[in-house]
Amino acid sequence: MKDIKCIIHLADIHIRNFQRLEEYSEQLTKVVDKCKEIASEYDKEEVRILIAGDLVHSKNTISNELMVFASYFLRQLEEVATVIVIAGNHDLIVENQARTDTMTALFDTADFQNCKFLDAMLNYKSGCAIDNNVVWCLYSIYEDFLRPTTIEEVKESNPNAKMIGLFHGQVVGSTLNNGYVSDSGLDGEAFEGCDCVMAGHLHKRQVLKRGDTEIVYPGSLIQQTYGETVSQHGFAVWNVEDMSYKFVDIDSDYGLYDVEIDSVNDVDEDKERLINF
């Protein structure tokens, strides 16, 4: 088995039931093409594509269009490299886990060949999964982001592996799109033992550092609301050897523009001010 050298880290895709599907089709095609370009520099076994939660938008209210669209997108990605998916708060009803969630339904019916739903593999609990030279340390939303109890044990038995935290939630001190700095969420100490954390949930791209561990949010793949910036939507690409990363933007012909004016005359005089670039 070849070592993993590259991880393409996506999050917060939010595929709708039927809304904006033309836009999503164009943008996700660009994403797949960019993933192919990045992965072409490696052997297929050396690349992983991670979706760090919120593949879909409407929790358990799903449509035929969504199931076809989401499964087609994942099939395209799994042709590029092995895909790892974790659940986010829009992929299930957190308060009613007795209901079958959308990710479980999708993976139970789609018969993916190279796409893995990590929460299901770990029996919907936090835990560690060894993947060649990487250990995926899942802080599962199904278990309220409990810290995996086996991190130290697995790290001791796999001393050369990269311990990568997977988390879809908020960290104390993270920043929302409106500029609010959160005082709720997981404390950074929860990620002790991880070499990095590949996170989702916050649509504002940002990097936090807690101790020696960087927590990276690539931001939403596609602009979701007027409250988000028009720019800086895409994903992160990781070099596993040194745990460095870079952000990749996906250009869009679509946008939700928040414009400020002092009076209607500003429109006539082209003096509108774009405030969410």
Residue ranges of each PLM-predicted region?
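Cofactor-binding loop segments of dinucleotide-utilizing enzymes, especially the Rossmann-like FAD-
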Residues: 12, 54, 88, 168, ...
